[in-house]
């Protein structure tokens, strides 16, 4: 069985959480591992009308048969970790989760630095979660690791070993990234970026998967890209236009209103190339065409929605395998058999 990596192709908030949740329930992976930066990105998913948001744990938590892992490349905030264990207790998460013992720790001092730094908080628009300062300490080799925190001892493991053992045994491993391509420290709109790379290559490294062991890379785009905080946004629309179209969203972590823009085909093509996308996922198609809401059969999509998907495939050069047509998990069109 393969390893599948899911990453964002825009500035985060693409709907990765809903795609990961669907894959977790539909494909039933044995392991769901989280890569990415840390608690500065929130993934949300709607289950039976109830919205769940996670910042530390894998978004595929609702697949109760899966082992949930947090890779060594991810920053861990113990306060957030234990809050989410309690928040998700109905899913028996505490019995299934493992944190790599090498994860660096976000301490209160890191969050304070993040929020009080005028440049980071005012100019860049950081989430204030402490990830930047914690990663800086990690680079300087002074950050604490998960193995140094006594409360985390019951959850410590070697994630890289677990993941590779699972792949050796033919298990399916689902790996989720955070944020999006436009926020990559290397390839994003620097300096208005996050504190590390966010591409599929980096996410694979975060959990200890070598390049030759990655089978599929799904890059997620939403019909109207959004951005929280400062930084270039070439296709941004006026807030009044977003209001008129009903495109009003708020960040999962910051609570700040998201800036909204038109779909950027050039950026999408570049993101797909750098991430090595084998397929694309398009979310919020119902925002682009309200008549597409809740449809689960591609042939039943209205013409406007179909033409948009076809244009994405043609201009980006990668097939669309998954399409979200609403907020619920079942609001999805799965075209992977056709790829």
Swiss-Prot record:
Q: Which Gene3D superfamilies match?
A: Adenylosuccinate Synthetase, subunit A, domain 1, Adenylosuccinate Synthetase, subunit A, domain 3
Name the domain of life this protein comes from. Archaea
Q: Cite the active-site annotation.
A: 13 (proton acceptor), 43 (proton donor)
What protein does this entry describe? Adenylosuccinate synthetase
Q: Show the disulfide pairing.
A: none
Cofactor binding mode and count? Binds 1 Mg(2+) ion per subunit.
- Tell me where it resides: Cytoplasm
The record's Gene Ontology cellular component field reads: cytoplasm
Residues the record lists as binding substrate: 252-258
Give the cofactors, semicolon-separated: Mg(2+)
Q: Which residues bind Mg(2+)?
A: 13, 42
Q: Which SMART domains match?
A: Adenylsucc_synt (SM00788)
* MF terms (GO), sorted A to Z: adenylosuccinate synthase activity; GTP binding; magnesium ion binding
What this chain does, per the entry, is described as: Plays an important role in the de novo pathway of purine nucleotide biosynthesis. Catalyzes the first committed step in the biosynthesis of AMP from IMP.
Metabolic or biological pathway: Purine metabolism; AMP biosynthesis via de novo pathway; AMP from IMP: step 1/2
Q: What is its EC number?
A: 6.3.4.4
Coiled coil location: none
- Residues given in the record as GTP binding sites: 12-18, 42-44, 258, 284-286, 324-326
SUPFAM superfamilies in the record: P-loop containing nucleoside triphosphate hydrolases (SSF52540)
| Record text on subunit structure and interactions | Homodimer.
- The top EC class is ligase
Q: Does the keyword Chloroplast apply?
A: no
Q: Which organism is it from?
A: Pyrococcus furiosus (strain ATCC 43587 / DSM 3638 / JCM 8422 / Vc1)
Entry's Gene Ontology BP terms: 'de novo' AMP biosynthetic process; IMP metabolic process
Grouped into one coarse class, the protein's main location is cytoplasm
Keyword Nucleotide-binding attributed: yes
């Amino acid at each position: 069985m393969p390893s599948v990596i899911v990453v964002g192709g825009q500035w985060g908030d693409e709907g990765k959480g809903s795609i990961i949740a669907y894959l977790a329930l539909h494909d039933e992976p044995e392991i769901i591992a989280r890569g990415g930066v840390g608690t500065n990105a929130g993934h949300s998913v709607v289950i039976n009308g109830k919205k769940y948001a996670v910042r530390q744990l894998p978004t595929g938590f609702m697949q109760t048969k899966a082992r949930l892992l947090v890779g060594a490349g991810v920053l861990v905030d113990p306060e957030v970790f234990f809050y989410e264990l309690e928040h998700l207790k109905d899913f028996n998460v505490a019995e299934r989760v493992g944190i790599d013992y090498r994860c660096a720790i976000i301490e209160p001092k890191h969050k304070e630095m993040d929020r009080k730094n005028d440049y980071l908080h005012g100019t860049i628009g950081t989430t204030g979660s402490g990830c930047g300062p914690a990663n800086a300490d990690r680079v300087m080799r002074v950050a604490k690791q998960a193995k140094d925190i006594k409360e985390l001892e019951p959850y410590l493991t070697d994630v890289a070993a677990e993941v590779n053992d699972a792949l050796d045994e033919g298990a399916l491993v689902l790996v989720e990234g955070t944020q999006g391509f436009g926020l990559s420290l290397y390839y994003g709109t620097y300096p208005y970026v996050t504190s590390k790379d966010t591409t599929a290559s980096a996410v694979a490294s975060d959990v200890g998967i070598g390049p030759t062991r990655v089978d599929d890379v799904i890059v997620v785009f939403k019909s109207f890209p959004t951005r929280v905080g400062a930084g270039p946004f070439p296709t941004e629309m006026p807030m009044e236009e977003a209001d008129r179209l009903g495109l009003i969203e708020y960040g999962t972590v910051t609570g700040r209103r998201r800036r909204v823009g038109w779909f950027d085909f050039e950026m999408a093509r570049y993101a797909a190339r750098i991430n090595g996308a084998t397929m694309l996922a398009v979310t919020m198609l119902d925002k682009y065409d309200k008549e597409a809401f809740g449809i689960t059969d591609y042939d039943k999509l209205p013409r406007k929605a179909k033409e948009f998907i076809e244009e994405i495939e043609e201009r980006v050069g990668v097939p669309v395998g998954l399409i979200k047509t609403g907020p619920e998990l079942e609001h999805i069109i799965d075209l992977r058999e056709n790829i």
